[in-house]
UniProtKB/Swiss-Prot annotation:
One of its GO terms (cellular component) is cytosolic small ribosomal subunit. Coiled coil: none annotated. One of its GO terms (molecular function) is RNA binding. The lineage of its organism: Archaea, Methanobacteriati, Thermoplasmatota, Thermoplasmata, Thermoplasmatales. Signal peptide: none annotated. GO terms for biological process: ribosomal small subunit assembly; translation. This is Small ribosomal subunit protein eS19. Part of the 30S ribosomal subunit. Keywords: Ribonucleoprotein, Ribosomal protein.
Amino acid sequence: MVSVKYVPSDMLINYVSGKLKEEKKIKEPNWVKFVKTGVSKEKPPLQDDWIYVRAASMLRKLYINGYLGISRMSSEYGGKVDRGSKRYHAASGSRSITRFLFHELESAGLVQKTQKGRSLSPQGMSLLDNASKEIIKQLAQKDPLYEKFI
């Protein structure tokens, strides 16, 4: 069985975000084009489909970490605040975006609420496992080193 940990993260996130966009599991709100993703950012993201990429990245983080709450998940997407010549100061990402995506992923059946935070549901696990299988098959066609994972 191929685990998400053995698949290159950029390929997995792009594949899963394409699946989420294609199956319309997440409703794209109106504010997506205008919102910043955190206090440390000056402008909104340049990608048009960044909300799907963020959702796929959140699913991958939940797969690897087991469970995460809104606060810890938003700190994963933080950065450093531009304070001029003053020292570095860490800032977390937008909690409202994280909360919105958790609600959307819960309504799609990919994430479930637990006592310790949010975790992947069996549907979410199977989505990521199937995606990693497909990616490993594609990589095995290009490079024979990946055939041992099939």
